[in-house]
Amino acid sequence: METRDVLEQVKTGIISIEEAEKYFKKQPFEELGYAKLDTHRQIRSGFPEVVFCSGKPDQYLVNIFLRLYEENGEVLGTRAQAAQYELVKEALPQVSYDEVSHILKVEKAGKIRQGKIAVCTAGTADIPVAEEAAQTAEYFGSNVERIYDVGVSGLHRLLSKLDGIQEANCVIAVAGMEGALASVIGGLVSRPVIAVPTSVGYGASLNGLSALLTMINSCANGIAVVNIDNGYGAGYIATQINRLGYSYGGENGTDIIFGMQQWN
């Protein structure tokens, strides 16, 4: 719940001044001993705290998930395993789990999604990382178009989807092996491109390092690169860009943000 929501509820009598005081006293974080829940993050950044599930002891994960759900009415976890899902589900039956992206979440019903992000992959093997990006962006309120298996070994596949890609406020390009997809897309669109190298590939791909270096050294303009397999990071920053688009230029934001003729 945001500060304004608390004040509105005090104004309308939904909660008392004493209850509001308790809420503000636990700002800006809640101490659990093993974790400090950042209850002010949405106020500062516009997005609530997200749980990185991998490596967390079982009971810690369950407690963190419950507290963030109680705080925000929804919660997102990344890099979760099926066994962790079963544990969280015992305490929070409405939680859902996606076996492809390894995302664990409880999401508010009736959420309005705006703008558009295009998520593209070079190959089918890149889809788990792409889905982490796509589902993160959807959770944070963006419309997402998935355009999968359009890598450079069959460039005609990408060109057949170019209209949809060019309509997006931001493009996420997910690729392993040599990682060329991001450069190709960067040369075809006027939108920002978030490049995500994946660990997909044979020996000399070095678990994604080859793709990472290709993307960092791209000749195409307008490309930013996140870490290897970091779909969550790509989905997050793409949503920030997408919000700028629909905030300033209508549904997709293209008239003001990306239509250069508007600046003449």
Segments from the language model and where they lie:
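Long amphipathic alpha-helical segments
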Residues: M1-Q81, Y85-E86, E90-A91, V95
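Short glycine-rich or small-residue beta-strand-to-loop segments that form or flank ligand, phosphate
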Residues: V50-V51, K116-A122, V171-A173, V225-N227
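Short glycine/serine/threonine-rich phosphate/pyrophosphate-binding segments
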Residues: L61, D126-E131, L155-H156, A175-V184, ...
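Glycine-rich oxoanion-binding loops at beta->alpha junctions
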Residues: I103-K105, N143-G164, L209-S210, V226
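Glycine-rich phosphate/diphosphate-binding loop of Rossmann-like nucleotide-binding domains
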Residues: Q114-H156
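C-terminal binding/interaction regions
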Residues: T121, D163-Q166, V200, A204-N264
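Glycine-rich phosphate-binding loop
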Residues: S160-T198
